[in-house]
Structures are given as structure tokens and as C-alpha cells.
């Protein structure tokens, strides 16, 4: 199984990246049967620096795992990195215009920042979704959005710590999340507008 993490492409979310790369969380993934963790960390973030104090092995660019993600990213300007941490392959890239295919490939579970676009992308692909609120943002509409989607039963919402993410992963096994309707839903669109503008 694979877990996909998206921080969005525009606003860095270092707390989320650090939480998912923490040994406690990688260990939790391993115990839950996940073998790949793919992280879209956003522009301007030093992903490699996160591995200086972690026991890991850098994977060669020509390895099957790194090569597959490079093909999905479809942009030679974007560096794709891979590390073996414990028994989990950790892949990372800054951004991609092909994000839906990447979510579809690596998202047995998706851990996302609380941006509406990323939430809807994952829900439209019928992915199990854990949403993490970036509390450093001013006028934190992300919290309202995450709470509303959670109250509707579509997602689990949590905070950017390894312990809380592990707890959310365990809860996810027992939650029956409600899929988002695939048809155009005027009621849902109005509800989303009211959340975004309230």
C-alpha cells in the first residue's frame, strides 16, 4: 500500500512534511502495511535536509520507484528524490501539473493540507482522506473547511504532529467515510461557498 501527502504547490507547510517524515510516523505506516510514502512538498522546501539526521539510504534516480514517479511528474525541471527509511520507500517532489494521476497511483490513503482544491481532488478520486490544518496561516479558513468536511463524514481532520497523524491512520481503518457524489451537486457547491465565505 502507498500513502500520498500533498502540501500544495504555493504555501509551504514544513510542519506537515516534518510530521510525516518523523520516525514515529514512518514506523506507524510500516506497521499498518504501507510500503511507499510519496510526498509533494511544495516549491522552495528543502526536502533533502529532512534526511540528514535520519537513518536512511538514498535511492538512485534510476531505481524503479524513483523512475516511475519521474514519469508521472512529467516535468524534467522537477527533481524527484527517493529514500529507504526503515522498510518504507519515501519519494518526494516539489510539484506537478499531473497531480491527479499521482494521487490516483500513490493514494491508498491521502494526507492533505486543508486547501479546498486538494481536498476535492482526492475526494473526486474516492480516496481515503486525512486533512491537516496549517495553523500558521492568517485568517485560518482551512480549519473551518476541514471541520465542515469532517462533520459531513467525508474526511478525518487532524493536526500536523506524528502522534496525531498515527492516531488518524489507525482511526481511518475503522471509519466508513462518505464518498463525495460524482455528479454536479448544486447543494454541495452552495455549502462549499458558505464555508469558504463565512
UniProtKB/Swiss-Prot annotation:
It is found in: Endoplasmic reticulum. Belongs to the glycosyltransferase 28 family. Its main location: endoplasmic reticulum. Involved in protein N-glycosylation. Essential for the second step of the dolichol-linked oligosaccharide pathway. It comes from Candida glabrata (strain ATCC 2001 / BCRC 20586 / JCM 3761 / NBRC 0622 / NRRL Y-65 / CBS 138) (Yeast). This is UDP-N-acetylglucosamine transferase subunit ALG13. One of its GO terms (molecular function) is N-acetylglucosaminyldiphosphodolichol N-acetylglucosaminyltransferase activity. Its EC number is 2.4.1.141. Keywords: Endoplasmic reticulum, Glycosyltransferase, Transferase. It holds the Pfam family Glyco_tran_28_C. It catalyses: an N-acetyl-alpha-D-glucosaminyl-diphospho-di-trans,poly-cis-dolichol + UDP-N-acetyl-alpha-D-glucosamine = an N,N'-diacetylchitobiosyl-diphospho-di-trans,poly-cis-dolichol + UDP + H(+). It is an enzyme of class 2 (transferase). Heterodimer with ALG14 to form a functional enzyme. InterPro entries: Glyco_trans_28_C (IPR007235), UDP-GlcNAc_transferase (IPR052474). GO terms for biological process: dolichol-linked oligosaccharide biosynthetic process. GO terms for cellular component: cytoplasmic side of Golgi membrane; cytosol; UDP-N-acetylglucosamine transferase complex. The lineage of its organism: Eukaryota, Fungi, Dikarya, Ascomycota, Saccharomycotina.
